[in-house]
Amino acid sequence: MSVCTLLISCAILAAPTLGSLQERRLYEDLMRNYNNLERPVANHSEPVTVHLKVALQQIIDVDEKNQVVYVNAWLDYTWNDYNLVWDKAEYGNITDVRFPAGKIWKPDVLLYNSVDTNFDSTYQTNMIVYSTGLVHWVPPGIFKISCKIDIQWFPFDEQKCFFKFGSWTYDGYKLDLQPATGGFDISEYISNGEWALPLTTVERNEKFYDCCPEPYPDVHFYLHMRRRTLYYGFNLIMPCILTTLMTLLGFTLPPDAGEKITLQITVLLSICFFLSIVSEMSPPTSEAVPLLGIFFTCCMIVVTASTVFTVYVLNLHYRTPETHDMGPWTRNLLLYWIPWILRMKRPGHNLTYASLPSLFSTKPNRHSESLIRNIKDNEHSLSRANSFDADCRLNQYIMTQSVSNGLTSLGSIPSTMISSNGTTTDVSQQATLLILHRIYHELKIVTKRMIEGDKEEQACNNWKFAAMVVDRLCLYVFTIFIIVSTIGIFWSAPYLVA
């Protein structure tokens, strides 16, 4: 029993040894007289056909400012080496072996548009060689490729970047580089949070140079990337729209509140801050202005214009008759036509189309005419009493003497007196008229001051109403402009949601 156990144990231990010997013998036979500088073709006039496939793993980052794309990918090379063919039955049914990179011939295919400091950023893995002579090599790598970033529609932009692979020293007659079937493999692709990948394409090109008649083939693997807009819409666009809409609140704020200018300047500074963020994201190029930058610039123009109009509104609101006269054109436009168009109602004024004055009329309005007519009527009615002024002035001396002599009552005044035209006049009547004249004179002064005060107050109210009209007009105009410009700018984008 012990002898049988010993024989079985020896057989088990000897099996892997024989297998290892077969593999060693295979390596020795394959490497005998093998030169890794020799192209693996039986006829030197034939090209080595190399098939290349890219297995995309992840888009790590897109640096718009430096126009560099960071990608994690595996390169899949296959070609046939006629020097590495064996009969697997002679070598213990070994179907494949591994060789380190550099041990056997490999194509000098490089990434032309690499911006890595080492240029070739692949990890040199082992090559798998099959008994049929097929060589399979899959070097992974983190690639940094240059890509021209088109920021015209940022953040609703689509970028088309590519890998350009080609032989560095072999022309097309010595190395024929071809894209493999299913040239761009995205079965293991990890989705990126910022970029969607709706399409990948492969294209083979042949380029001829003036120095050489041979073609130089290359293979382009294109990445059609579309930016996801949720982040920018939620963190930049919506806050900017809401901030811009706050400028409309400035036109509804009363001028006496004293915060109209403060609000507009605060909004302007906020828009400038958002614009600085966009400028930091965008590459320093003058070829195009990003769509988001156009939107922010438009918002900044709106806020700047609203600040200017706010200053103008405050200037109108605090004008007085001592400093400014309202011209007829300004009066007709701001007090009648625009309020009628905007359906603004002023207490005590009923505006209809029939009552509107001509826009360029220089005649005073009806309210001014009635006010002037009332003043003239009052002066005319009071001037009738002035007919007695001459007689009163003729007899003023007598009245003064009578008062100085102690004649304190009308009964002590002479009953008759000769007037300037030689007629006899009742002295008591003259004294009464004199007192009434003095009362009239004082009332005239008071009335004049009241009328002047009313006119000044009316003029100030006109300026304040004109400021209110400009405020309301700006509210409507800026609201329409903000809505139309926002829709127009974003409607021109190739897409809104990725």
Curated annotation (Swiss-Prot):
It is found in: Postsynaptic cell membrane; Cell membrane. Keywords: Cell membrane, Disulfide bond, Glycoprotein, Ion channel, Ion transport, Ligand-gated ion channel, Membrane, Postsynaptic cell membrane, Receptor, Signal, Synapse, Transmembrane, Transmembrane helix, Transport. Residues 1-19 form the signal peptide. Its main location: membrane. It is a multi-pass membrane protein. GO terms for biological process: chemical synaptic transmission; monoatomic ion transmembrane transport; regulation of membrane potential. Residues 315-472 are cytoplasmic. Pfam families: Neur_chan_LBD, Neur_chan_memb. CDD domains: LGIC_ECD_nAChR, LGIC_TM_cation. It comes from the Eukaryota. Disruption phenotype: Uncoordinated movement and reduced body wall muscle currents. These phenotypes are probably related. Disulfide bonds join C147-C161, C211-C212. GO terms for cellular component: acetylcholine-gated channel complex; cell projection; neuron projection; plasma membrane; postsynaptic membrane; synapse. Residues 20-230 are extracellular. Glycans are attached at N43, N93. GO terms for molecular function: acetylcholine-gated monoatomic cation-selective channel activity; excitatory extracellular ligand-gated monoatomic ion channel activity; transmembrane signaling receptor activity; transmitter-gated monoatomic ion channel activity involved in regulation of postsynaptic membrane potential. Expressed in the body wall muscle. The chain crosses the membrane at residues 231-252, 261-279, 295-314, 473-493. Belongs to the ligand-gated ion channel (TC 1.A.9) family. Acetylcholine receptor (TC 1.A.9.1) subfamily. After binding acetylcholine, the AChR responds by an extensive change in conformation that affects all subunits and leads to opening of an ion-conducting channel across the plasma membrane. A subunit of the levamisole-insensitive nicotinic receptor. This is Acetylcholine receptor subunit alpha-type acr-16. It comes from Caenorhabditis elegans.
